[in-house]
């Protein structure tokens, strides 16, 4: 019997083994090892409100001989992280992004959880807790999400007047900030239907449609319509703003006032004329319901409805109704005031 195997037969014997090795190498890659020292968080999304205290959990299962823990915030729409705090387990150094409102919880020696006091609108976003031990770094990511309300905003000059930077400033002037895509999506799931496109914080331009119709994106499926990439300096749209719970209180003063008289009336009560974001927050979180139009600080006249009824808004859904921007000298409305507690 010959001791050699013909080449074709040898290839046939080798092929199944080679295919098995190839399948294991490419089809079933080894799983990426998870964190060795950091425990995975029980909740990756932490919910909070403006003015509250939020805790972002980061706990070590065991302590390496030498290490540092680095907290940073991942900026939306940008490929960079902003440093917040570094600790070596004994001492911590604050880098000032949160203005001294950030500290470590230190519930025990393996606790590196981050506490953020007096949460602000700009604190919402994605955070990273990174363990640096000089051998193999590892990290966990968490998202701080604020409860709030998204509202469309345009100036007295009419629709599509803002470039990106003007839209950002306009929201801040109305006690808000530009909404993120996730905030707009959440508002859409809660009933926001709006045909005018507006800037978002990431620099995109979108609008939410619940009832698809010809003059509002066409007869397609409901969803978030997108205008694609836009020039932040040249292109002009409205703004979608986001605000959260208030530290103070919104109240209505009846009368037939001009805008300047409205400012005087609120000042006499130790308050200021409310901003648009104040009114939306009071409607959302305090259930403010009033059929009377009132002046706001931007010169618009609006009123909040939580229980729609005849001759009180004329629309079936709750929300903040607008009379637009009447002449400031027109003495026909009361005013909504805002007072800090």
From Swiss-Prot:
The residues forming the signal peptide are 1-27
| Coiled coil, from the record | none
List where the protein spans the membrane: none
- Where does the protein end up? Secreted, Extracellular space, Extracellular matrix
- Quote the tissue specificity entry: Brain.
Q: Which GO terms describe its molecular function?
A: hyaluronic acid binding
Sorted alphabetically, the keyword list is: Disulfide bond, Extracellular matrix, Hyaluronic acid, Immunoglobulin domain, Repeat, Secreted, Signal
One Gene Ontology cellular component: extracellular space
Query: Could you tell me which PROSITE patterns the record lists for this protein?
Result: IG_LIKE, LINK_1, LINK_2
Residues in Link domain copies: 149-243, 246-339
UniProt entry tagged with the keyword Secreted: yes
Cysteine disulfide links: 58-129, 171-241, 195-216, 266-337, 291-312
Q: Return the similarity comment.
A: Belongs to the HAPLN family.
Query: What is this protein called in UniProt?
Result: Hyaluronan and proteoglycan link protein 2
Q: Which organism is it from?
A: Rattus norvegicus (Rat)
Gene name, please?
A: Hapln2
């Amino acid at each position: 019997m010959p001791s050699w195997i013909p080449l074709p037969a040898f290839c046939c014997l080798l092929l199944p083994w080679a295919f098995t090795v190839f399948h294991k190498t490419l089809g079933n890659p080894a799983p990426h090892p998870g964190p060795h020292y950091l425990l995975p968080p029980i909740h990756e999304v932490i919910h909070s409100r403006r003015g509250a205290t939020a805790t972002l959990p980061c706990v070590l299962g065991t302590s390496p001989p030498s290490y540092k823990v680095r907290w940073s915030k991942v900026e939306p729409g940008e490929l960079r992280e902003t440093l917040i705090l570094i600790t070596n387990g004994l001492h911590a150094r604050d880098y000032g992004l949160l203005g001294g409102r950030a500290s470590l919880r230190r519930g025990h020696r393996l606790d590196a959880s981050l506490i953020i006091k007096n949460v602000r609108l700009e604190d919402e976003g994605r955070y990273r807790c990174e363990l640096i031990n000089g051998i193999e770094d590892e990290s966990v990511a968490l998202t701080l999400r604020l409860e709030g309300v998204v509202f469309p905003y345009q100036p007295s000059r009419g629709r599509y007047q803002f470039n990106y930077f003007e839209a950002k400033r306009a929201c801040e002037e109305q006690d808000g900030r530009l909404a993120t895509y996730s905030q707009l999506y959440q508002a859409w799931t809660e009933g926001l239907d709006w045909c005018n496109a507006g800037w978002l914080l990431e620099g995109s331009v979108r609008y939410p449609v619940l009832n698809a119709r010809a003059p509002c994106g066409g007869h397609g499926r409901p969803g978030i319509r997108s205008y694609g990439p836009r020039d932040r300096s040249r292109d002009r749209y409205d703004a979608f703003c986001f605000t959260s719970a208030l530290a103070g209180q919104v109240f209505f003063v009846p009368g037939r006032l001009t805008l300047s008289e409205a400012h005087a009336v609120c000042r006499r009560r130790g308050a200021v004329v409310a901003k648009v974001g104040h009114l939306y927050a009071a409607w959302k979180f305090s259930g403010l319901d009033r059929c009377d139009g009132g002046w706001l600080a931007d010169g618009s006249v609006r009123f909040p409805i939580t229980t729609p009824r005849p001759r009180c808004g004329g629309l079936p859904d709750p929300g903040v109704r607008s009379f637009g921007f009447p002449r400031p000298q027109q003495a026909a409305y009361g005013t909504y005031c805002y007072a800090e507690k």
